[in-house]
Curated annotation (Swiss-Prot):
Coiled coil spans: none
InterPro entries tied to this protein: Ribosomal_bS18, Ribosomal_bS18_sf
Signal peptide segment: none
Protein name: Small ribosomal subunit protein bS18
Sequence similarity: Belongs to the bacterial ribosomal protein bS18 family.
Keyword Transmembrane helix: no
Length: 78
């Protein structure tokens, strides 16, 4: 039997910490859209590796952007 794992886990990193971002703003759609899947759901931090501080800011920014019609609430193809 092999002791080696079947796949190699890559270390997850926080994109906002790497960019030295102080605050996640709702007007910065390029950063926000990386954290939304195609049906307009917010990707959890356990998948993206985002720190909890930035995940809370990101969720708040996405909700504000949706309210201001900068981002859709649901997918258009439904």
């Amino acid at each position: 039997m092999s002791i080696l794992p079947r796949y190699i886990r890559h270390r997850k990193f926080c994109r906002f910490t790497a960019d030295k971002c102080i605050y996640v703003d709702y007007k910065d759609l390029s950063k926000i859209q990386h954290s939304i899947i195609e049906n307009a759901k917010i990707i959890p931090s356990r998948i993206t590796g985002t720190r909890s501080k930035y995940q809370r800011q990101l969720a708040r920014a996405i909700k504000i952007a949706r309210f201001l019609s900068l981002l859709p609430y649901i997918d258009q193809n439904r």
